[in-house]
Every structure is written in structure tokens, then in C-alpha cells.
Amino acid sequence: MIKETLAYKISQVNPNFSVMTGQAVPVLPPGIKLQNVTIKRFNDSLFDINEIQIKPALLSFLKPETIYTFTGRTGGGAFDGKAFVSREKSDGHSRININLNEIQILEIPGFQDFSRYQAAGLLSGQVVVNKSRRPLISAHADLNLANAMLTFPSPVFGLNNLSFQYIEGEVTLASRRMQIKKCTFNGNQVDGTISGIIILKNPFEKSTLRLSGSILPHSDFIASLGQGIASMLLPQLKSAKNGLRFKIRGTLEDPRFSL
């Protein structure tokens, strides 16, 4: 009964999302513990959650807005936050604040299943999700990815992967439009920035990319490319103080990179 009620509540927030729960048990203080939870968008798995505990703030039942606190584990890391749900049926507004702490994205299906490029790293940050009376969701996130690695399906410039000390970014979501407002990365081979728009589609891997930015290759990386490629890049780097401009087009499953 608990699992069915939760699944119904999720579908009421947005019919495109569903939740599957392996086990649900009550806990004290009054609340619920869910184990082996999978969150899906349409038929695509986005997140696998090992465990999450949800507890209501009992005094909030006397107010126009009910508050729930939650803590959980996923991807070897942790998350916590609060959900604010309006009790007015005519309002239908809700908000969720989420704090992420060193979650390994290699274990998150939503990061792995929709692209040929394998991504790894420890994700931390804050996410705020808002839902209006209509089935419209907006979100804002400030995120940090530490010890990150992007592995290519086949070598690029002789590299099997790119590794980064950190990637920091600000992301917003309005309906199907995801905007990377600013993102900086510091890596072992290249540094740079990226921004732009991702138009979300169904299936998710068909989402279109309109991204651009700049990269500044490290000198030892340029040297490793060989004299031919290095001789082509060095004049461009000398004339571009902020690095080489690039674009990424195509889709999540098949991104196209160009200088």
C-alpha cells in the first residue's frame, strides 16, 4: 500500500516520471524507509537509490504547506533535503531542495545509458526543483564534479580518456530546455569553459545539443600529439588568448565536436 501510494504521488507531480520500490517500511520518528528505489522518465531509468528515509515535519500539517525531510544513499555517496508541498488543491505548487555529497555518477544510469561516452566522477552540489499547478517543472542547480574522467569509445588524438581535477557548473531547467549557464573545468590535459542549451527529447538520448566554449590544452598534452598536429594548434593558441573556441552539436548519444 505504501509503495502504491508513493508511485501515485510521483505521477501526480509529473506523469512523465515513475518510481519503482523494492521495499518500504515505516520508521520512528514517524516516517518511511524505502530501499532499492528506481526513478524513471518514461521507460528510461534515471537514478537508482540504495535507501531513502522520508519524514514529515508534524507541525507543518497545521499549516498551508506540508514539509518533508529526507536523507538517502546512492552511488556510494549521500543526499539530503526538504520537500515543500502546498495543501491547497487549487495551488498544486511544490518545491524540493536537495544537497548532493560525493555521488559517483558512474553508478547513475541517467549519466551512462544515453551516450557513447562513459563519465565518472564524484558529484556534489545543490539542486532546487519547482513544480507549478500545471505539469511544468523548473529547476536550478549549482554542481561540482571532482576527480572526473570522460572515456571515449575510440581514441581521440591518441587519448582513451580525459581526466579533470574538477568541473563546476550552474544549470537551469525550464520545461524541455536545459541551459548550462556557466561551466568551467580544470583537467590534466586541458582547461576550459562551456555553456549553451540542451533541448530534452524522448527518448532522452535524442536530446539535441547546442553547446559552445573554449579549451586551453596543456603544453605537455600538445607535445604528445606529435609535431604535425602541434604545429597546427600552436598558431591558433597564440592568437586566441582564452583558448580555442569549439562547438558541440548533435545529440546526447552522438555528440559532434568541432573547432
Where are these regions (language model features)?
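Amphipathic hydrophobic-ligand
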Residues: 43-54, 73-82, 110-129, 158-169, ...
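Short, solvent-exposed aromatic-acidic interface loops
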Residues: 71-75, 143-149, 184-188, 214-218
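Acidic, Ser/Thr- and Pro/Gly-rich intrinsically disordered regions
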Residues: 54, 65-68, 77, 105-110, ...
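Terminal hydrophobic membrane-targeting helix
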Residues: 1-81
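Beta-propeller and related beta-repeat scaffolds in trafficking/envelope systems
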Residues: 22, 44-59, 136, 140-177, ...
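Generic short beta-strand segments
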Residues: 35-39, 100-106, 144-150, 216
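Transmembrane beta-strands of outer-membrane beta-barrel proteins
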Residues: 68, 94-96, 139-141, 211
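Short "repeat-start/strand-capping" segments in structured domains, especially the N-termini
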Residues: 66-67, 120, 136-139, 198
